[in-house]
Swiss-Prot record:
Keyword hit for Iron: yes
Keyword Iron: yes
Limits of the PLAT domain: 29-160
One GO-annotated biological process of the protein: lipid oxidation
Any one GO CC term of the record: cytoplasm
Protein name: Linoleate 9S-lipoxygenase 1
Residues binding Fe cation: 522, 527, 713, 717, 861
Recorded family membership: Belongs to the lipoxygenase family.
Pfam family, one: PLAT
Disordered, as annotated region: 220-246
SUPFAM superfamilies linked: Lipase/lipooxygenase domain (PLAT/LH2 domain) (SSF49723), Lipoxigenase (SSF48484)
Family matches, as CDD domains: PLAT_LH2
Gene3D superfamilies membership: 3.10.450.60, Lipoxygenase-1, Domain 2, Lipoxygenase-1, Domain 3, Lipoxygenase-1, Domain 5, PLAT/LH2 domain
Length: 861
């Protein structure tokens, strides 16, 4: 029967022609961290002969025996390798020839089926048919792991790079399109295996490990009104023994094996795998080494010179058995990254940007304030719109939480203005870390942490810089939450012990800001909220769908890095809990904040207006006018935002010309419905969700998704080491309360203020762990793909979108030039500040490494 069908397909022998193609593949071991050294020898693929077959699928000639699906060509097999490519990774790609039988009736191939009869998987990059008669070149972008066929329940199929809306799909390809989506959705059951490609949702019930005792129990996030959360990728691991509602965890040594759909572990030597390996090494090997190093010695820095030795001299690690185990366990390629050593076991860190030019400028009030506009967390500051500041916490539960700052505290610093005049002139701003922290502060302070909730008021000076006016530090009333808070207000001083107290007050604010930054600005508002978009896009939008092609680069590695984070970073006892002041309450606290998350407000212009730092203004270039003109994050960000929106507008307008076309796109409607009702299901009834009924709603939504995944993440991630790599500037923990007069701590503060400061903030061991973490998080991989770039230049066949994408890239290049110009303008004092650190976090491109610039396409580290 099969012989008759293929004979009918290709006709007599005289009619058949040959179509030659090129297949690009990558060997499994190239990307295997456990055998990195061995893999670099680059063995030739053992895939020749009849071990890998390809069958083209016609988009114009049907197969009557196969339910109106396109006919298959005869199988074709890989021929001898043509050449070896050497990309930036340590491995290599190999190109093979493949020759297909073809005839006129077969027409244009729209897809192909691949079968792997080999024992190992391989990474398939692409298939290119160079000269299909009467059509020319046909290119298939694959970028997928192909396992032995026995591992799959259905054929592996890949489509040509011609996008189609569902209604425009060639009839003979529709069933293939639909079946591929069914495969990717799975049926919601079973434990996922390494070769699976299934995308599904789950709640965050895998952060704790109740089988290891009560101290390792963590609140389930998601699925409840009390602790709502974005969904994560489902792994299907069995429940824990002691709590059937908690998912079991995999052992630390298997951290690289945590499930994500196989193609979310891309075919490149990616930073997220490096991060996972590095974090595992820190937890498993470096921490015991550091404990051994500090055992029997005080876990304190005695002076700022002590701290500087981390960067200028290094710390000699003991040459004990654990150190030998460390060097034996980590591939040689990574030793220099984890331990910058000259072979003598010296733990040394690069000098962070914040102390590169001056060792003391970070302590100035101007720099303290400037980093709220141009530091690593420039997304919190807001305009003060009522005085004194009022709390939004429920007074029934928390009593009076309103601020105790009075006009007397600040009016002598307002350049002759009253408080009302300063507010009316848009001169007063606030960094408000009160309401988010107070509900947890009583519990947080039962740990080694001794922290406050803080409010910081600032004044916008005529030169465009901000001046701190007052810091209010509050902690829960000792008699109970219903009695409100105990607060004290501190004001700037540069004389005597009051100056030291003011420096400590700023440090308590920085501790708050670091914790809010890591858990909310960074983890929640980029990593966590984007994962449901990754899952829904793969489940509901075919790879043929134009919107899949638009968004796909902005999801690269996100599920992988988030899975690694659940395993090593944000889990019970993980690195983040060990470094931030919220400790074991950190993730639960982020769930409470998620209650206020609003998707349309993630658009940069909307965010700036909501925080009161901008007002809507149709005459301004981006539709908003900044009230702080020299606001580097906002100025550069609005340029990037507008470039993204122009690109998305051009792209979407090519495919959708009317509301009707949006409404009849069944894949698009299913995608948006699933995002609302499942991916962000705890917020499905919110009135602010776009209805997805117009091209403009699609444009706005896609622009916001791309902004979150690219520029917003870059702004809050890659400045971590430049600003927080020097822990005194951004301490993660406070261990003592503010010294009171008459106490030994107060006398120490008068006698040795630097030592008292260092005894208050992050301890020595935590500092080393924290600096190690932010250094890893702040690095770019050498094969990073930045905004305005694509992995494959042939990602679509449509010429108009390709031209629009080219315009997008050129616009980003222009923005780079503008950023350089602004950074060179001495009038814009907030661009570099007292520390002389030019603002480059939204500079679109970068080299690999620790650069403090570059906008990767996706949340990939």
């Amino acid at each position: 029967m099969i012989g008759q069908i293929t004979s009918g397909l290709f006709g007599g022998h005289d009619d058949s022609k040959k179509v030659k193609g090129t297949v690009v593949m990558m060997n499994k071991n190239v990307l295997d961290f456990t055998d990195l050294a061995g893999s670099l020898t680059g063995k030739i693929f053992d895939v020749l002969g009849q071990k890998v077959s390809f069958q083209l699928i016609s988009s114009v000639q049907g197969d009557p025996t196969n339910g109106l699906q396109g006919k298959h060509s005869n199988p074709a097999y890989l021929e001898n390798s043509l050449f070896t490519l050497t990309p930036l990774t340590a491995g290599s790609e190999t190109a093979f020839g493949v020759t297909f039988d073809w005839n006129e009736e077969f027409g244009v191939p729209g897809a192909f089926i691949i079968k792997n009869m080999h024992i190992n998987e391989f990474f398939l990059k692409s298939l290119t048919l160079e000269d299909v008669p009467n059509h020319g070149k046909v290119h298939f972008v694959c970028n997928s792991w192909v396992y032995p066929s026995l591992n799959y329940k259905s054929d592996r199929i890949f489509f040509a790079n011609q996008p189609y809306l569902p209604s425009e799909t060639p009839e003979l390809l529709r069933k293939y399109r639909e079946n591929e989506l069914l495969t990717l959705r799975g049926d919601g059951t079973g434990k996922r295996e390494a070769w699976d490609r299934i995308y599904d949702y789950d709640i965050y019930n895998d952060l704790g490990n109740p089988d290891q005792g009560k101290e390792n129990v963590r609140t389930t996030l998601g699925g409840s009104a009390e602790y709502p959360y974005p969904r994560r990728g489902r792994t299907g691991r069995p429940p824990t023994r002691t709590d059937p509602k908690s998912e079991s965890r995999i052992p630390l040594i298997l951290s690289l094996d945590i499930y994500v759909p196989r193609d979310e572990r891309f075919g490149h030597l990616k930073m997220s795998d490096f991060l996972t390996y590095a974090l595992k090494s820190i937890v498993q090997f470096i921490l015991p080494e550091l404990h051994a190093l500090f055992d029997g010695t005080p876990n304190e820095f005695d002076s700022f010179e002590d701290v500087l030795r981390l960067y200028e001299g290094g710390i000699k690690l003991p040459q004990g058995p654990l150190f030998k185990a460390l060097t034996a366990a980590i591939p040689l390629e990574m030793i220099r990254e984890l331990l910058r050593t000259d072979g003598e076991g010296i733990l040394r860190f690069p000098t962070p940007l914040v102390i590169k030019d001056s060792k003391t400028a970070w302590r100035t009030d101007e720099e303290f304030a400037r980093e709220m506009l141009a530091g690593v967390n420039p997304v919190i500051i807001s305009r003060l719109q009522e005085f004194p500041p009022k709390s939004k916490l429920d007074p029934e539960a928390y009593g009076n939480q309103n601020s105790t700052i009075t006009a007397e505290h600040i009016e002598d610093k307002l350049d002759g203005l009253t408080v009302d005049e300063a507010m009316n002139n848009n001169k007063l701003f606030i960094l408000n870390h009160h309401d988010v922290i107070i509900p947890y502060l009583r519990r947080i302070n039962t740990t080694i942490t001794k922290a406050y909730a803080s409010r910081t008021l600032l004044f916008l000076q005529d030169n465009g810089s901000l001046k701190p006016l007052a810091i209010e530090l509050s902690f829960p009333h000792p008699d109970g939450d219903q009695f409100g808070v105990t607060s004290k207000v501190y004001t700037p001083s540069d004389q005597g012990v009051e100056s030291s107290i003011w420096q400590l007050a700023k440090a308590y604010v920085a501790v708050n800001d670091v914790g809010v930054h890591q858990l909310i600005s960074h983890w929640l508002n980029t990593h966590a909220v984007i994962e449901p978009f990754v899952i829904a896009t793969n489940r509901q939008l075919s790879v043929l769908h134009p919107i899949h092609k638009l968004l796909y680069p902005h999801f690269r590695d996100t599920m992988n890095i988030n899975a690694s984070a659940r395993q090593l970073l944000v889990n019970a006892g993980g690195v983040l809990e060990s470094t931030v002041f919220q400790s074991k309450f950190a993730m639960e606290m982020s769930a409470v904040v998620y209650k206020d998350w609003v998707f349309p407000d993630q658009a940069l212009p909307a965010d700036l207006v909501k925080r009161g730092v901008a007002v809507e203004d149709s005459s301004s270039p981006h539709g908003v006018r900044l009230l702080i003109e020299d606001y580097p994050y906002a100025v550069d960000g609005l340029e990037i935002w507008s470039a993204i929106k122009s690109w998305v507008t051009d792209y979407c307008s090519f495919y959708y010309g009317s509301d009707e076309e949006i409404l009849k796109d069944n894949e698009l409607q299913a995608w948006w419905k699933e995002l609302r009702e499942v991916g962000h299901g705890d917020k499905k009834n919110e009135p602010w969700w776009p209805e997805m009924e117009t091209p403009q709603e699609l444009i706005d939504s896609c622009t916001t998704i791309i902004w979150i995944a690219s520029a917003l993440h870059a702004a809050v991630n890659f400045g971590q080491y430049p600003y927080a790599g020097y822990l005194p500037n951004r301490p993660t923990v406070s261990r003592r309360f503010m010294p009171e007069p008459g106490t030994p701590e107060y006398e120490e503060l008068k006698r040795n203020p630097d030592k008292a400061f260092l005894k208050t903030i992050t301890a020595q061991l935590q500092t080393l762990l924290g600096v190690s973490l932010v250094e890893i998080l702040s690095r770019h991989t050498t094969d990073e793909i930045y905004l305005g770039q694509r992995e494959s230049p042939e990602w679509t066949k449509d010429k108009e979108p390709l031209a629009a994408f080219d315009r997008f890239g050129k616009k980003l290049t222009d923005i780079e030039k503008q950023i350089i110009q602004r950074n060179g303008d001495n009038i814009l004092t907030n661009r570099s500040g007292p520390v002389n650190a030019p603002y480059t976090l939204l500079f679109p491109t970068s080299e690999g490494g620790l650069t403090g610039k570059g906008i990767p396409n996706s949340v990939s580290i």
